[in-house]
Amino acid sequence: MYWESKRNNDQKSLSVDLLDGHYHSKGENKHDTYEVHVAKAHSEYDFIFLSVSHGFVKEALEILRKNNVKGTLVFFCNFWNTRKEVEEWAGDYVYILAFPTAGGQMQDDHLDGVLFDYLMLEGEQKAYISNYTDLTALLTSADLKWEVPHDMVEWIWIHMAINTGVTSTAARSGNLENPEQLALNLMNSSSELSLAIKVIREALKVVEARGVNLKLYKAELLPYKIPAWIAGKAMKIMFAKNELTRKIMTLHNDKQDIFYCCQSVYQTGQELGVKIPILEANMKGISL
């Protein structure tokens, strides 16, 4: 399915440039044309992958309901909401939470993207969908692996906290009109990356204050436990050598989405009385 509120329903195709990390760690550059098939009213699908920018989830679901489009929902995007709120969004739809390790940007009829070889997927016991094995079979057929975190909602919050540390540090020094250059500046500076590590730690305190036991996510959070100056140097080397990660950083140019992520974490931190001085300073420096 293809849905985006800003797109023209008469659009027939998209040109796609993809750095594909499926089979090679450095990625392969691929180009193709994606044929757009707009879902018809009263149609039914095995799965509906819902991957939209912040604030569009409810709107997308209303369009699906209005057109009586049915199928198992796969939420494939960031959100700072609770599981109860997600359940309210879904309503009568059965759903599962997942998150792609992919990214990119859309300009006119062209998609420039990066794809890794795995994604995050809610465990079968928490998903409550009858076609879980069909979904994993679909992923396998596309040569995609998956990881199952302790809790998918909590994992997304953690992911947003990490993003907040990185993007708020990048954005504090300039206008978000040019996020690509801000990302490059950050990745080329070990001192700025060290600062980002410190902000990530503050942002994770906000997640913890929401009731998340961070000890259940030791593997994901281990890189942020080592001394910040060492982590900053390691991250600089990683960005220099890992083209997939480097490109996904430079392609992330949705400034409203970036601001939504940072503002959500920052505002919750203030509401819960969490001390986040570096993040607060970063937020004051961000200019849309």
Enumerate the language-model features and the residues they cover:
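Glycine-rich phosphate-binding loop and adjoining beta1-alpha1-beta2 segment
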Residues: 2-29
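Rossmann-like NAD(P)(H) cofactor-binding subdomain of soluble oxidoreductases
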Residues: 26-112
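Rossmann-fold dinucleotide-binding core
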Residues: 80-165
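Helix-loop-beta segment of a Rossmann-like dinucleotide-binding subdomain
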Residues: 110-126, 173-186, 241-252
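Inter-helical turn/loop segments and adjacent helix faces that build the functional surface
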Residues: 146-147, 182-186, 269-275
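Active-site-proximal catalytic alpha-helix in oxidoreductases
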Residues: 153-184, 190-204
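NAD(P)-dependent Rossmann-like dehydrogenase/reductase catalytic/cofactor-binding core
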Residues: 197, 201-288
